[in-house]
């Protein structure tokens, strides 16, 4: 049995042997744990509150044998050669030859998103589209990525008309469903994630590498955590194990001198004493259909002007599964996270007020010289898988070797 599949029980006296404790077994925790164990010689304990590893990337076969992503679709995409090579140690890949492509259902019509020159030619007649294409290239340059809010500022009436179409049919209602806010209220970092592309590129991402692990994300995480120096404990809240006292962290009543890498929700670590950090959560509705296809070969369809859900994912097109019996889809319904049982904080709602609240919690951690915050929950920010992997690798590199490793050199 792989170490990652075990729920281990260990004698109290052995707990003080660990050089590092990693809280959370998602991409952040698993990467830093592997690096500390392998490169720094640390004995690492990974504590995971859920009953499985892999964080929100966790996948599993459903009752019909179709591999599904339990917490919504996750796709690895990157231009970082070092990150791609690192994760390739633990998985082979199904790389998308033509990139990951997404379409929007606009009143029953499917158009490529991000909005690009192909989309332009779909909604305008040939002559008008050619003239508008020339204007867009002249204003922004061929191949550029223009955030919708910036496009709306262009004084040219024809470009404004394009911007208004995109705003109303691609961004506005979808954004309000996803975030519970208008685009004007949302951080530019968020609205800039899906720009208007001045190109004929239908790919949702423009990264060199795009795809999913060949045998699933879970298998990749199992291999990452399968190391003689790593112990994995699932189904445990870290607060059952660690006590945070003034200026020191206790491990079952004894001061812990090693590193604690925390990847969970920072406000919940402190029992939300200043109030909850606002997040958007998601409700997922899985459905299996006794038919070969539901979305005409599209893995993801965004519903930008209709429906209460934001998108539908058809998993067999995401994972390229060939032996699927029927097809399984998932609908996503966003809502405001309240901290109730079963709710999961997915997306930090970034604005100055929420950042100030986060900084209050972060200040509480400064008394612990051996506590490190890592990940989208601990840092209250958005990360793609590649950026999170890179950050975890850098953190591991910055930490010292364990004492026994130093003595061997």
PLM ranges: what are they?
Residues 37-61:
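Glycine-rich FAD pyrophosphate-binding loop
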Residues 39, 240-364:
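Mid-domain catalytic core of redox enzymes
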Residues 109-110, 114-258:
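Active-site/ligand-binding neighborhood in enzyme catalytic cores
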Residues 344-409:
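C-terminal catalytic lobe of FAD-dependent flavoproteins
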Residues 20-46:
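N-terminal Rossmann-like FAD-binding beta1-loop-alpha1 element of flavoenzymes
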């Amino acid at each position: 049995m792989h170490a990652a599949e075990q729920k281990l029980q260990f004698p109290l006296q052995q707990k003080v042997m660990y050089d590092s404790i990693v809280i959370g077994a998602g991409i952040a925790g698993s990467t830093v744990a592997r690096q500390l164990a392998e490169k720094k010689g640390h004995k690492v304990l990974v504590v995971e509150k859920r009953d499985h590893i892999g964080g929100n990337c966790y996948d599993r076969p459903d009752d019909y044998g179709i591999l599904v992503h339990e917490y919504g679709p996750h796709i690895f995409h990157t231009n970082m050669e070092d990150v791609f090579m690192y994760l390739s140690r633990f998985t082979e890949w199904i790389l998308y030859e033509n990139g990951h492509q997404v379409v929007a259902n606009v009143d029953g019509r499917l158009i490529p998103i991000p909005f690009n020159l192909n989309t332009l030619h779909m909604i305008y007649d040939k002559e008008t589209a050619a003239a508008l294409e020339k204007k867009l290239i002249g204003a922004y340059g061929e191949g550029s990525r223009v955030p919708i809010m910036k496009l709306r500022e262009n004084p040219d009436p024809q470009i404004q008309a394009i911007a208004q179409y995109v705003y109303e049919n691609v961004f506005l209602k979808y954004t309000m469903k996803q975030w519970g806010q208008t685009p004007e209220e949302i951080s530019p970092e968020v609205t800039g994630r899906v720009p208007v592309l001045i190109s004929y590129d239908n790919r949702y991402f423009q990264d060199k590498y795009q795809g999913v692990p060949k045998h699933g994300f879970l298998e990749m995480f199992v291999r990452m955590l399968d190391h003689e120096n790593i112990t994995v404990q699932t189904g445990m809240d870290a607060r059952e194990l660690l006590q945070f006292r003034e200026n020191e962290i206790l491990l079952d009543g004894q001061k812990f001198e090693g590193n604690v890498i925390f990847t969970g929700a920072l406000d919940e670590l402190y029992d939300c004493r200043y109030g909850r950090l606002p997040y958007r959560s998601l409700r997922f509705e899985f459905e299996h259909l006794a038919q070969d296809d539901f979305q005409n070969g599209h893995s993801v369809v965004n519903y930008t002007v209709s429906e209460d859900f934001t998108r539908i994912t058809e998993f067999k097109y995401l994972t390229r599964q060939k032996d699927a019996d029927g097809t399984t889809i998932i609908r996503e319904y966003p809502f405001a996270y309240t901290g109730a049982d079963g709710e999961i904080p997915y997306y930090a709602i970034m604005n100055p007020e929420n950042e100030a609240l986060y900084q209050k919690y972060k200040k509480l951690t400064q008394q612990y010289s051996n506590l490190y915050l890592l990940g989208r929950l601990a840092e209250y920010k958005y990360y793609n898988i590649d950026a999170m992997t890179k950050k975890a690798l850098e953190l591991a590199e910055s930490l010292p070797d364990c004492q026994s490793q130093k003595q061997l050199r």
